[in-house]
Design a protein with these regions (language model features):
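Short acidic-hydrophobic, aromatic-tinged amphipathic segments that line or gate anion-handling sites
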Residues: 174-178, 182
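Metal-dependent phosphoesterase signature
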Residues: 19-35, 61-70, 84-88, 97, ...
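Conserved hydrophobic residues forming the short capping helix/wall of the S-adenosyl-L-methionine
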Residues: 78-83, 124
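Active-site neighborhood of HAD-like aspartate-dependent phosphohydrolases
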Residues: 2-53
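Substrate-recognition element of Asp-dependent hydrolases with the DxDx(T/V) motif
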Residues: 38, 42-78, 87-101, 147
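Acidic, Mg2+-coordinating phosphoryl-transfer loop and its flanking beta/alpha structural elements
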Residues: 135-174
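Conserved Lys-Pro-Asp/Glu-containing loop-to-beta segment of HAD-superfamily phosphomonoesterases
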Residues: 108-144
Length: 193
């Protein structure tokens, strides 16, 4: 009989406005800047034994502003930049769709565009993550909602769009000033719940 996979907790991170500066559509690598504390935050998660997974809507693909190869290049550059701080991302997951705008097969409703939980559920399956012991950090209500719909706790950060936002239909489990503040709160919870 096969042994069941051991699961671990994770911290899911929105990308734009949470890890890196919000610049509208990140369509050039020279626009990419990590937010202060992002490297330290990811490194702290790594040291805790939790996985770190980026979950991001990238409708710019569907709108024809850039392609999936470019998104891969952005993620490689984020990994390189975080690596300089001794931090590692365990996985990047993105949704290229938009329900009302876009080209070809990218223009459609889907289960992966936040606030739908599809990307978190896929990552949990592929990376053996226990969602009930996990967290989703983001700067928008849809990030919080996606995490909570997947069974994780949702944390709203006041960077990116979060500066001017309160939670929408899902009240966050915590509101933090930035990613580092959010991670310190998570680690203060005892890593798992």
């Amino acid at each position: 009989m096969p042994m069941p996979k051991k699961t671990s907790a994770a911290v899911f991170l929105d990308r734009d406005g949470t890890i890196n500066e919000e610049v509208g559509y990140l369509d050039r690598l020279d626009k990419l800047r990590l937010l202060p504390g992002a490297g330290e935050a990811v490194r702290l998660i790594n040291r805790s034994g939790m996985k770190v997974v980026v979950i991001t809507n990238q409708s710019g693909i569907g709108r024809g502003l850039f392609d999936e190869v470019f998104v891969g290049a952005v993620h490689a550059e984020i990994s390189r930049m975080l690596g300089e701080a001794g931090a590692v991302i365990d996985g990047f997951y993105f949704c290229p769709h938009h329900p009302t705008e876009g080209i070809g097969g990218y223009r459609r409703s889907c289960s992966c565009r936040k606030p739908a939980p599809g990307l978190l559920l896929r990552a949990a399956s592929e990376l053996a993550i226990d969602l009930s012991r996990s967290y989703m950090i983001g700067d928008m209500a849809k990030d919080v909602e996606a995490g909570q719909r997947a069974g994780a706790k949702g944390i709203l950060v006041r960077t990116g769009y979060g500066k001017d936002m309160e939670a929408g239909s899902s009240a966050p489990d915590h509101i933090a000033s930035d990613i580092l503040d959010a991670v310190r709160w998570i680690l203060g919870q005892g890593k798992t719940r």
